[in-house]
């Protein structure tokens, strides 16, 4: 039985056309019992292992490595013989520099080592092995320890198999096309133009292998394969545990916080909250998730302690009372009738997933806190992969053919669907597309073939994993420049190891909210305390939104959003959530229906009275997933957990799955006294909207965040716009829009006066004084020098304009070129004098005062067009 043992996947970036799934399919199609992945990294190892197990193929995981021996590079293939061997590979993969072979051997445990070239073997080890009296050509297996003076390593730990006896083949492809594709990927990686096709190196099938290799050689190969036994299931991380009894600690925290909450809100139904809390804790403890909530609670407490602003909540976690009581979210799920089962359910074994929005400029601090608290080796950020999209694939392949300009034409006729295949394209009747394929079919075919191929690794924007012990025992890692670890396993495969994932998303809007509140809050209040005093029902805030005053408002700046705000005219957070939920692909098809019913009413008799209360607030239009869950619960008497499972099944658009759930739904609906006609109508209603339903929990969390920004803009507009001016300094278009909006708002703008101007814009007496950073052509060095001039201005008595100009031009002080000095004058930087001046003879005016033409021009407000012209016109 032959096994392809030296195989690269496409995680050896731009060096293979084979995904882990394709590797496994090759083995299946040829009835090979095993297959290997041996990239120079372990990015694809876990995906490969899981795919093999799902298809009854034996997975062999290896690492392609270049080591140094006597100042020569030697290519080795390290194969994990066991879970311990896989952990050894993890340790080696963490070392990101070339190893000397002696130091490598010191680390090898349960590893088979294969020399990748017999020529390399002979030239590199000839002297060593002759001295040891070993006949290479007659010895199918040699002990590496004897070759490199590491006698402590025994043959069960390190085995080096001579390739003359194994003739191990390196995988290239299934077909000629796949090998061609590999060559194109190689050329993309080194930015080369198209070369002559290389020799085809096929993925060997059983028949060919039997012809090429002797029985002894195949037996040696099978002997090695049989000794490789991986079961990564046994490497799954132990459950995260923070205390002796995390469940009891969590319950105590929640009960204490619930009592405080109810004491402040005496009118609430205490029993309803208590029952809800007990239900949630029961599910959380049953699934052993208490520690997860305690970690997030501790992180939130750290944020409050440091006055770091976190978001109002995102995703289905907003539907949890436990999360609300732990200050992880800000929306009361009982009052807003949110569904916990949408977040966590005993019907799903998924680990909880709480996404936390934090201030963008504090994310690194929060991550450092986690690494310090739980241990550097127990935490890691998560890898992600930048993959080819249709656009980038077409451009790169066209470049290989020296057809730089043709890519735009091809992209102009290609469908936007990222999943479309070349076969699909050939079957279309679009004449322009067919003409394109006739002329550039090879470019299109190759480009579509590499869509979704990984191009390089990167760091996931938010994900972090935390374990109870060292992650290196479980998964492969890399080390980042800041000494933090990065997983070599991407997000979608980490759940296999039972690792707790946390998402910390940096949000610039939270930074803005915090910065603005810092300017306006009383000195004895924190930012978080001030935020808690903001009324959620300020009608002036909603009026401004309806008046399309949404510049700088979270999620509401686009033209479409402004139009929808005018049409719906929200007056509450809940109505704002509807706006956010409707303005999405798919859901937008319901906007006209909703608007029409909102303003003109609708026939409620057309809706079964038993489900009318569920859809009444959205005028009979299904907008939220929670509505579907509640309808299914009422009609078919499902539990909330069952109803959410039903919703998930329907939204997947899997015909077989839909039919299976449909039968069960109808049976239970009839048992619950719904007739067939009504049930059919309701099911059709659900099926139509299920794919577009939005998560109400998420919509409310983000609606509150939108409201916070709108409230600050309405009540403290000067500070709000000041932040926008300073934040968007690099965007001229944004700056123009801000300045024009300032004028409409009646806020006065003044020039960056040289006697007090700061690099950034500042507020004084409710007026905005523009910053030096906004002046075109004035760089950081100029600003530093102008601050020297400013110091002299502030300390000089009997100040004269000629003094200031002299300091500006003096190479030891200001060193400002004359043309830039004139720019400062035009910008009004000298307007702090009683008079301003018209510089007729600019070259000599600062020396000879009689060359100055005095024109009385008191400091005055300029209109927006003046500032836009001066700041942004080159």
Swiss-Prot record:
What's the short name of a Pfam family annotated to this entry?
DNA_pol3_finger
Q: Which GO terms describe its molecular function?
A: 3'-5' exonuclease activity; DNA-directed DNA polymerase activity
Keywords (A to Z) from UniProt: Cytoplasm, DNA replication, DNA-directed DNA polymerase, Nucleotidyltransferase, Transferase
What reaction(s) does this enzyme catalyze? DNA(n) + a 2'-deoxyribonucleoside 5'-triphosphate = DNA(n+1) + diphosphate
Listed GO biological process terms: DNA replication
What are the subcellular locations of this protein? Cytoplasm
**Major localization class:** cytoplasm
| Family (UniProt) | Belongs to the DNA polymerase type-C family. DnaE subfamily.
Known function: DNA polymerase III is a complex, multichain enzyme responsible for most of the replicative synthesis in bacteria. This DNA polymerase also exhibits 3' to 5' exonuclease activity. The alpha chain is the DNA polymerase.
Give the protein's recorded name: DNA polymerase III subunit alpha
Species source reads Mycoplasma genitalium (strain ATCC 33530 / DSM 19775 / NCTC 10195 / G37) (Mycoplasmoides genitalium)
**Gene name on record?**
dnaE
